[in-house]
Amino acid sequence: MNISNKYGLRNSPPVRTSDGLADEAHPEMGMASKLLCLFPSSLVNYLIALAAIFSINFILPRLMPGDPLQAIYGQEALVVMSDEMEAQLIRQLSLDKSWWDQMLAYILSLMQGDLGFSYYYREQVSQVILGALPWTLLLTGLALVLATAIGLILGIESGYARGSSLDRGLVAGLMFLGGFPDFFIGILLLLIFAVSLQVLPISGATSPYAGHEGLAHIADILKHLALPLASMILVQLGGIFLLTRNTIVTLLEESFILTARAKGCPERCIKYAHAGRNCLLPLTTATGLRIPQLLTGALFIEIVFSYPGVGSLLNTAIDARDYPLIQGILLVITLTVLTANFLVDLLYSRLDPRVRYAH
């Protein structure tokens, strides 16, 4: 019998809080609050970091001793600066104006996507970088996804079979590989598979003058990508594997794992659905920390394999002392790292509701 009916009380309507009334009266406010929840509270920190990056990128070239034009194109430069080029550089960089005017012109140029002019390639810096950036993003993106997936699976299997020969072999082997830099592993793979066995191409991203189209072109790209990608995966695999394995070893002693076993859940379900899913939070945090390392490793790997990415472009710009191009590359790399870390923060707040509710 209902207690309220027993004492002659009517069922009271559900209580509506002030937040609920506000959402009903102003549905756009509720939608706005939901949209704000999509962004982490550290957005202000990213904006401050972005402003600091722009400031450093503006100030550093102007702190060079002597004439900035001679600092950029002196006697050691591979490109001789003509009078027309000097006048264009002074006008473009606003070197005949005050620092505040130069800063304003710099910010306006960035807002318009103008990163300067490359005097080695005789082209806009943004166009030069856009030609190389997709190759670097392809290499680092695939390395990040594949290394994370393989490391997650191997870590779960190894942690679940702790103390076995499989566990000991994986720990020893992946720790050994993780101790080498990316470019060293790349040189070894290059000597074995490209020079000795001659089963994979030695350099480049595509076969020149091959005329491949469709699936043949994709297969050619993947064939050239195999060695650089394998070099980065082998080095990154150790850290992901150890983090996942240690997390699994800790989780197997938790009460919810014992409860799942007591309910009769299959071991495969416990391994991946219960223990494996809880590895995603620390793995997501580690991913944000590994992105700068991945990009740095990709720069050296591209030089080893003559891969036409941002790393090879930066090497050429340094040799030619093309400072506008160097500035543009460093700015794009830094913005890529900031954007990737921001997306990781967003993903973390989606995976762990406690982070959302804490703010």
Identify the residue ranges that each predicted region occupies.
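Transmembrane alpha-helical segments of polytopic membrane transport and secretion proteins
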Residues: M1-Y46, R162-G163, L346-H359
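Alpha-helical transmembrane segments of integral membrane proteins
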Residues: S33-L36, I129-L166, Y209-H359
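Hydrophobic alpha-helical transmembrane segments of membrane transport/permease proteins
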Residues: L50-W100, L197-I218
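An internal, D/E-rich "acidic patch" concept
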Residues: P27-L35, L95-L152
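Hydrophobic residues within alpha-helical transmembrane segments
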Residues: P40, V44, L142-L146, G173-F176, ...
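Helix-terminus/capping and membrane-interface signal
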Residues: E28, A49-N57, W135, L139, ...
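Membrane-water interface segments at transmembrane-helix boundaries in multipass membrane proteins
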Residues: A172-G238
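Short hydrophobic, aromatic-rich alpha-helical segments embedded in or entering the lipid bilayer
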Residues: V80-Q112, F305-A317
